[in-house]
Amino acid sequence: MEKSHFFAHLARMNLIQRWPLMRSVSTENISEHSLQVAFVAHALALIKNKKFDGNTNPERIALLGMFHDTSEVLTGDMPTPIKYYNPAIAEEYKKIELAAEQKLLSMLPEEFQEDYAPLLDSHCINKDDYVIVKQADSLCAYLKCLEELNAGNHEFAQAKKRLEKTLQTRSTPEMEYFLNTFVESFNLTLDEIS
């Protein structure tokens, strides 16, 4: 039987810190972030289906959220301002991410690669589903900014402004519903939400 290092690599998601150039009150790793993205992506899919006549598979989208940053166990987390500093850097980094996705996929026993490709390989991921995951990813980054700002960390003020613009460009009815229904609670204390 062939040995695989796939899950040993995924177990290292908790070692990859997000926001590496920012001073954080509360650190966040890609394992924690991916779970929150899965929660939010699942909610967005449900909202789309129940409120806006969507036809998505919320469980599938939650899985995509869980796996959306797995390539970072090989690449690390590249800060967004650097990653998108100019189109050439963004294009080259996308190639690095694709190579990392392929490397991870190749670590699986061959009989499972077809099953994991739609979760790991950008070329195989359903584009409509991925839009929801990207929305959730942006929402979770925005929520992190709120958390840090509410803890008195003004380091995240510019990131919050940038993410507000991103949320506007990615706006959909389901995202607006999520923002209006759930986000205000992130500005409250534990006593206030209990």
Curated annotation (Swiss-Prot):
Amino acids binding substrate: R18, W19, H33, D69, D77, M78, P79, T80, D137
Keyword Cytoplasm: yes
One Pfam family hit: YfbR-like
Primary localization: cytoplasm
Site (Appears to be important in orienting the phosphate for catalysis): R18
Catalytic activity: a 2'-deoxyribonucleoside 5'-phosphate + H2O = a 2'-deoxyribonucleoside + phosphate
HD domain boundaries: 30-142
Gene3D superfamilies: Hypothetical protein af1432
GO MF annotation: an example: 5'-deoxynucleotidase activity
GO cellular component, one term: cytoplasm
Annotated a divalent metal cation binding sites: H33, H68, D69, D137
Named cofactor requirement(s): a divalent metal cation
Coiled-coil features, chain-numbered ranges: none
Signal sequence range: none
SUPFAM superfamilies, alphabetized: HD-domain/PDEase-like (SSF109604)
Compartments (UniProt record): Cytoplasm
Recorded superkingdom: Bacteria
InterPro entries, sorted: HD/PDEase_dom, HD_domain, YfbR, YfbR/HDDC2
Entry keyword set: Cytoplasm, Hydrolase, Metal-binding, Nucleotide-binding
Summary of subunit composition and partner proteins: Homodimer.
Protein name, as recorded: 5'-deoxynucleotidase PBPRA2627
Originating species: Photobacterium profundum (strain SS9)
Lineage: Bacteria, Pseudomonadati, Pseudomonadota, Gammaproteobacteria, Vibrionales
